[in-house]
């Protein structure tokens, strides 16, 4: 009886897998689902809710992702020591920020979830200055969720997604980032294993494609 069960299972498993609805969101290897910002005098702060694969490689292969909070701080110079502290869900986070000479900004990353926050009070110690800033989300009431945004792109670029789908699987990985230039937008990158990328800029409220390019 057990042997008969195994034979039946081996027969039906491919059929079950073939009829399972493909979820393209499963192939998102980098997700920036929230962005909180504040600008004050000579200082600017950006806080990202990020889920990112490790190792972080644009090779068309989706790996396991981890949830992070990434903080970027811009100051008049990078000559001062800099640290950050903040609280999420009653838990305190913080530490020294490293300085990126190329991007000319300080950086801090920690395992914390700010994806659903609308505001985040942050304390920055920059040299002898103590800055108390409150970063606000760039999302609006009508901003699409990342999943809804990807569904909208799939509907608008159905031919492209069909080309990148084989045997009920997406043949690549997806970058999906909430960004802001005066208004919120989404960036989506479709990366295939042959190193090609299809990049899209979309409105955050409707998912309308504003620009696209291939490289």
At which residue positions do the language-model features occur?
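Aromatic sugar-binding surface patches on proteins
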Residues: 93-109
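Short, surface-exposed binding/anchoring microloops in extracellular/periplasmic proteins
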Residues: 31-84
């Amino acid at each position: 009886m057990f042997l008969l069960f195994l034979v039946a299972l081996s027969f039906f498993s491919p059929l079950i897998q073939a009829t399972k609805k493909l979820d393209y969101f499963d192939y998102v290897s980098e997700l920036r689902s929230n962005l909180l910002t504040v600008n004050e005098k000579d200082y600017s702060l950006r806080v990202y809710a990020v889920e990112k694969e490790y190792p972080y490689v644009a090779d068309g292969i989706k790996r396991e992702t981890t949830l992070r909070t990434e903080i970027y701080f811009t100051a008049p110079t990078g000559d001062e020591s800099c640290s950050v502290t903040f609280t999420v869900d009653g838990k305190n986070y913080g530490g020294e920020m490293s300085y990126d000479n190329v991007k000319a900004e300080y950086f801090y990353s920690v395992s914390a979830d700010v994806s659903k926050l609308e505001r985040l009070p942050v304390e920055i110690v920059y040299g002898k200055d103590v800055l108390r800033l409150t970063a606000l989300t760039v999302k609006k009431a009508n901003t699409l969720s990342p999943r809804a945004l990807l569904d909208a792109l799939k509907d608008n670029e159905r031919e492209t997604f069909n080309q990148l789908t084989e045997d009920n699987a997406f043949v690549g990985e997806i970058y999906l980032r909430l960004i802001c230039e005066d208004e919120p937008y989404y960036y989506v990158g479709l990366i295939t294993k042959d190193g090609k990328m299809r990049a899209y800029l979309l409105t955050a409220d409707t998912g309308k494609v504003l620009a696209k390019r291939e490289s």
